[in-house]
């Protein structure tokens, strides 16, 4: 028994010495009081351009055909799409939609969207919102969750209501109404 204790003594001493020598760091900030949340409604147009000499979205991957339908299941697109005040591509740019979308349904045209909407003009210049969700592009009513943000939209939550404004070939203009609590 004493022999066993002598073997364990260096191990126990090392553990005790390590526990004493390790320090933890923690700070506590005093409560500053209740800060009321803001509610913001944003309205802009999203321009997804796949065709032409200067596309804003490009295909980076495509799965082998898995269905006889022409749905393009498994296509992944990367985008840096302009966000503008009006539906015309030459209207004032207010930001960029940077992220990716993937065709994730075998029987319908449905995209899973993963985007940061980066605002480059106006009151929210430099701020972003993070949008993630299912986008069934032929549904009349669509809803995408806002899951976070930066700058003025830090800790943001809310939802976006995209509505297809115009489709020409594979290019689309989508009207967005975004409702954010931050």
UniProtKB/Swiss-Prot annotation:
One of its GO terms (cellular component) is apoplast. It comes from Arabidopsis thaliana. It is found in: Secreted, Extracellular space, Apoplast. Dirigent proteins impart stereoselectivity on the phenoxy radical-coupling reaction, yielding optically active lignans from two molecules of coniferyl alcohol in the biosynthesis of lignans, flavonolignans, and alkaloids and thus plays a central role in plant secondary metabolism. Transmembrane segments: none annotated. Glycans are attached at residue 125. Homodimer. Pfam families: Dirigent. This is Dirigent protein 1. GO terms for biological process: phenylpropanoid biosynthetic process. It comes from the Eukaryota. Keywords: Apoplast, Glycoprotein, Secreted, Signal. The gene is DIR1. Residues 1-24 form the signal peptide. Belongs to the plant dirigent protein family. InterPro entries: Allene_oxi_cyc_Dirigent, Dirigent.
């Amino acid at each position: 028994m004493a022999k066993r204790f002598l073997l364990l003594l260096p191990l126990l001493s090392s553990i005790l010495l390590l526990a004493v020598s390790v320090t933890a760091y923690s700070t506590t900030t005093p409560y500053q009081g209740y800060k009321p949340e803001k509610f913001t409604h944003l309205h802009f147009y999203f321009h997804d351009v796949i065709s032409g000499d200067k596309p804003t979205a490009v295909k980076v991957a495509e799965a082998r055909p898995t269905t006889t339908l022409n749905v393009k299941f498994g296509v992944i697109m990367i985008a840096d799409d302009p966000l503008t005040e009006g539906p015309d591509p030459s209207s004032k740019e207010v930001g960029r939609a940077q992220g990716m979308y993937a065709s994730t349904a075998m029987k319908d045209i449905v995209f899973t969207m993963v985007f940061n909407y980066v605002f480059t003009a106006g009151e929210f210049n430099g701020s972003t919102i993070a949008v993630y969700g299912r986008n069934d592009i032929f549904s009349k009513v669509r809803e995408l969750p806002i899951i976070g943000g930066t700058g003025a939209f830090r800790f943001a939550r809310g939802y976006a209501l995209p509505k297809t404004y115009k489709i020409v070939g594979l290019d689309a203009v989508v009207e967005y109404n975004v409702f954010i609590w931050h």
